[in-house]
Swiss-Prot record:
UniProt entry keywords in alphabetical sequence: ATP-binding, DNA damage, DNA recombination, DNA repair, DNA replication, DNA-binding, Meiosis, Nucleotide-binding, Nucleus
Family: Belongs to the activator 1 large subunit family.
Biased composition (Basic and acidic residues): 1-15, 50-74, 186-200, 288-298
Any one of the GO BP annotations: DNA damage response
Pfam families: AAA (PF00004), AAA_lid_RFC1 (PF25361), BRCT (PF00533), RFC1 (PF08519)
A single GO cellular-component term on record: DNA replication factor C complex
Name under which the protein is recorded: Replication factor C subunit 1
Compositionally skewed regions (Acidic residues) per UniProt: 866-892
Feature: compositional bias, Gly residues: 158-183
Low complexity composition-biased segments: 916-925
Length: 956
């Protein structure tokens, strides 16, 4: 046993000796043994300590002897008492915690001041070990009772973490383990006593004005739970320590930037138990508990008189409802004003009231105010301005997320400058204007817009004298879909000839629909306002409507609506219908049931599934993320699941999880085949669970790099690129196969050609270029290409398919002059080359035959039917009545083919169509002609017979 362990055990013997109310039968012997035999006392204390480590608070609360001892102490909440009873007999901390709670009941201000004094960092805290803190409480046991009640407040929760099991500490889950060094960077450990402490409830504003920064792993709360607890009670959470930070919330000093910055600025350190005590002390109900128990049943009705906060909150809804009844008596204007939606009622009246983006509003104001000076109604661009200059743009494009004030700013700026705004939004037809306008602008909105920008005609309700200046607002231009065919192109044409300014508004300026429109507009990108800016505006609206809500709750509302201030005002109005005092939890509950739908990319979905909080997502949320793109999300998960390391798992456990995830991905692929091939769409959710949800739930955690130089973010699915390359190679191989079959030099199938023939073809095409002289090598290679009907594209295909990773390029040693001579020689012989396949030349007036059909025709089968003796059948024996039906069609096709072949022969191109069945079909044509045309038929028959006979002879 190490020296620090001996010192720690002796400290607890001293603490047990100073506990006067301990009724345990083992506490006394431990103290006596410490005086007579130190070695035996250490062994006894160690046995008690190890026995205590195997117990938790939920099981240890069943000890009846300790419950009787605790009854001597004044009453406290039952759940809290079970948590404090979970400590060992040798630890006097539970009794001290109960005394501190009683002390808190006497005076509410003491815990705050005491925590600020006791939670300053010390050397023992800096060591990161809970044992040092435990020794501090033992040293204070010798002091008077007042000091004894103050110090254990800090060590109650810290001591439990410090005295955790040794295995837990080495694993990084105890208080002494911490988050480790660089190798554990980015890993957030689970709280060592998660769910074992009762979370207190205080007044809603007990933490108002306090700013907290959370660092490290807390004792029983997750970081998100601690943030919600602080915000629920009016506190503010920031990400870094500054001069405005009140407390650094951490249960151990793990070092790092936050801790060093806090020590440098003198920021006070606060533990989780200290935070609980601050919140618990603000609740005045505990102060009246002893009074009700002592004064009997007559005093039971008294507590409502001692809780003024409830009286105030109950009286405020009445005060809120009374003004609602007053406005009807004040006139019709008030009735109309109260019936308006808040988004219209509190719409900004001047540009300065717009939340955020003031610089863009000023830029829009300057552009619109100088528009007529720049273009002067001439319809042409200003002189002296470059095309890429902002002042040379006749239109402006406002882009940004919905609800951040784009349309409002356009209308307010136009109104302030004296322009009359003509708005055209997605509900209007914005297609291409008619070229011939007979009735002016009547009946067509697109025509009215066209004439408006030309100033050729005006609507009936448009008074030119009163409004000499006009601005056209084209809202939601990225929503021009199939119903507005040609709308974007017509809008660009209108901008070019426009005599009035045009303001275009969209949500996504990077949409493919607006790719050409952006070049003709001045882009102004609106950004989301900060949550502080939105909370300030929402607080103004809440006060005007008589609502009670704190700024922290409004900031949470602003953060949840993703910068959409219109949605935030609507949600605030909905909640005001049922409550006049809105709390932090009310906003969270409201937005949880009516969250705004948003489009997320597959990368964002994978990040959320594999993130630290991926295990906390509900099942419906995981399904929504996986089904956001059911084709791409599983591919991204399969590409990146190996890079994720689950928190708190060793290498063996991680390999087991990887194997289970791979098996689940394979099952998902099998289900996907059933869905795509057999249209079993009822299995889509099963495929989603197997291919996305299960792998992400097994491996969610931190992402690490497996190869040096790799970027630490999710890669795009590599299967898509490989599948595209495989499809391209398959098409090229099909072309090569058809050409080789047409040459009659080989009758191999496509697989045989790829496996057996392709290496030999590659050697015959490249070896002469490397070994023989230039002229001889070029001639040999070109002759070989002609014999197998290999084109220049086929030559490149053979080279591409012959490349393998780790092997050298076949054309590596060929000099550039030889390559140039080969290309030149091949092109020179192109005019006299005999083309043996139909798809290598396009005959005018004849459709190109499908490649698969040509390949089937070129298969090495018997050209014509034969009789029992092996001789070809006669012409009149081959066909039946069906041949007679096809005679007329074949005759016309044959005439066209002959004329086209003559034209090609005149150009010097010799075409030989030596396909399957060519001779027999020609014979049928000749027989049909011979019946009615005499000599001409005989001549044609002789020609066809000659061709057929030669073909048959070659086959024999």
């Amino acid at each position: 046993m190490s020296d620090i362990r001996k010192w720690f055990m002796k400290a607890h013997e001293k603490g047990n000796g100073s506990a006067p109310k301990s009724t345990s039968s083992k506490a006394g012997p431990v103290k006596n043994a410490a005086e007579t035999a130190p070695i035996k006392s250490e062994q006894a204390s160690e046995d008690l300590e190890t026995a205590d480590r195997r117990k938790t608070s939920k099981y240890f609360g069943k000890d009846k002897t300790k419950v009787k001892d605790e009854k001597e102490v004044e009453a406290i909440p039952a759940k809290r008492k079970l948590k404090t009873e979970s400590d060992d007999l040798v630890k006097p901390r539970p009794r001290k915690v109960t005394k501190v709670v009683d002390d808190d009941d006497d005076d509410f201000d003491v815990p705050i001041s005491r925590k600020t004094r006791d939670t300053t960092p010390s050397k023992k805290l800096k060591s990161g070990s809970g044992r040092g803190i435990a020794s501090k409480t033992v040293d204070n046991d010798d002091d008077d009772d007042g000091e004894d009640k103050e110090t254990p407040l800090k060590s109650a929760g810290r001591g439990r973490g410090g005295r955790a099991a040794p295995g837990a500490s080495t694993g990084g889950r105890g208080r002494g383990g911490g988050r480790g060094g660089f190798m554990n960077f980015g890993e957030r450990k689970d709280p060592p006593h998660k769910g074992e402490k009762e979370v207190p409830e205080g007044t809603p504003d007990c933490l108002a004005g306090l700013t907290f920064v959370i660092s490290g792993t807390l004792d029983s709360l997750e970081r998100e739970e601690a943030e919600d607890l602080i915000k629920r009670h009016g506190g503010r959470i920031t990400g870094s320590v500054s001069k405005k930070t009140t407390y650094l919330l951490c249960d151990e000093d793990i070092g790092g930037r936050k801790s060093e910055k806090a020590k440098e600025l003198g920021t006070k350190f606060l533990t989780e138990d200290g935070l609980f005590d601050i919140i618990r002390s603000s609740k005045p109900v505990k102060k009246s508990l002893p009074e009700r128990s002592n004064k009997g049943t007559e005093k039971i009705c008294a507590p409502p008189k001692t809780s003024p906060q409830k009286e105030e909150t109950r009286g405020k809804p009445l005060a809120k409802s009374s003004p609602k009844k007053v406005p009807p008596a004040k006139g019709k204007n008030k009735i109309i004003e109260t019936s308006l939606p808040w988004t219209e009622k509190y719409r900004p009246k001047v540009p300065n009231e717009i939340v955020g983006n003031q610089s863009l509003v000023t830029q829009l104001h300057n552009w619109l105010s100088h528009w007529h000076d720049q273009f002067g109604g001439t319809g042409s661009k200003g002189k002296g301005k470059k095309l890429n200059d902002a002042g040379s743009k006749k239109a402006v494009l406002l882009s940004g997320t919905p609800g951040i004030g784009k349309t409002t700013s356009a209308k307010l700026v136009s109104q302030m400058l004296g322009f009359q705004a003509v708005e055209v939004n997605a509900s209007d037809s914005r297609g291409k204007a008619n070229s011939n306008i007979a009735k002016g602008i009547g009946g067509s909105n697109a025509n009215s817009v066209k004439e408006l920008v030309n100033n050729e005609a005006m609507a009936a309700n448009f008074d030119r004298s009163k409004h000499p200046k006009t601005v056209l607002i084209m809202d939601e231009v990225d929503g021009m879909s199939a119903g507005d065919r040609g709308g974007v192109a017509d809008l660009i044409a209108s901008i070019k000839i426009s005599k009035i300014p045009i303001i275009c508004i969209c949500n996504d300026r990077y949409s493919q629909k607006l790719k050409s429109l952006v070049n003709y507009c001045l882009p102004l990108n609106y950004r989301k306002p900060t949550k502080q800016q939105m909370a300030k505006r929402l607080m103004h609206i809440a006060k005007a409507e008589g609502l009670e809500i704190n700024e922290i709750a409004l900031e949470e509302l602003a953060e949840r609506v993703n910068g959409d201030i219109r949605l935030a005002v609507n949600q605030l109005q909905y909640m005001s219908l049922s409550m006049s005092v809105i709390k932090y939890d009310d906003i969270r509950q409201r937005l949880l049931s009516s969250a705004k739908d948003e489009d997320i990319s597959p990368f964002t979905a994978v990040d959320k599934l594999f993130g630290y909080n991926g295990g906390k997502l509900r099942m419906d949320e995981r399904i929504d993320l996986s089904m956001s793109d059911p084709d791409l999300v599983p591919l991204l998960i399969q590409e990146n699941y190996l890079n994720y390391r689950p928190s708190g798992k060793d290498e063996a456990k991680r390999m087991d999880l990887l194997a289970r995830a791979a098996e689940s991905i394979a099952d998902g692929d099998i289900i996907n085949v059933q869905i795509r091939r057999y249209r079993q769409w009822q299995l889509s959710q099963s495929c989603c669970v197997a291919s996305s949800i299960l792998p992400a739930s097994l491996l969610h955690g931190s992402r690490e790099v497996l190869e040096q130089g790799e970027r630490n973010f999710n890669r795009f699915g590599g299967w898509l690129g490989k599948n595209s390359t495989a499809g391209k190679n398959r098409r090229l191989m099909e072309d090569l196969h058809v050409h080789v079959l047409a040459s009659r030099e080989s009758s191999a199938g496509r697989e045989t050609l790829r496996v057996d023939y392709l290496p030999l073809l590659l050697s015959r095409l490249t070896s002469p270029l490397q070994t023989l002289p230039k002229d001889e090598a070029v001639s040999e290679v070109v002759d070989f290409m002609n014999s197998y009907s290999i084109s220049q594209e086929d030559f490149d295909t053979i080279l591409e398919l012959g490349k393998f990773k780790g092997r050298e390029n076949p054309m590596e040693g060929v000099p550039p002059p030889v390559k140039a001579a080969l290309t030149k020689k091949y092109n020179e012989m192109n005019k006299t080359r005999m083309v043996r396949v139909a798809d290598m030349v396009q005959l005018p007036g004849v459709k190109k035959a499908p490649k698969k059909r040509i390949a089937a025709m070129l298969e090495p089968t018997v050209d014509s039917l034969r009789d029992e003796d092996g001789e070809p059948l006669a012409d009149n024996e081959e066909g039946n009545g069906s041949d007679a039906e096809e005679d007329s069609e074949e005759a016309t096709d044959g005439e066209k083919l002959e004329s086209n072949l003559k034209n090609l022969n005149a150009r010097g191109i010799q075409v030989e169509l030596d396909l399957k069945g060519a001779g027999s079909s020609g014979s049928r044509k000749a027989a049909g002609k011979g019946r009615g045309r005499g000599k001409a038929a005989d001549t044609s028959a002789e020609k066809k017979a000659t061709g057929r006979g030669s073909g048959a002879k070659r086959k024999r």
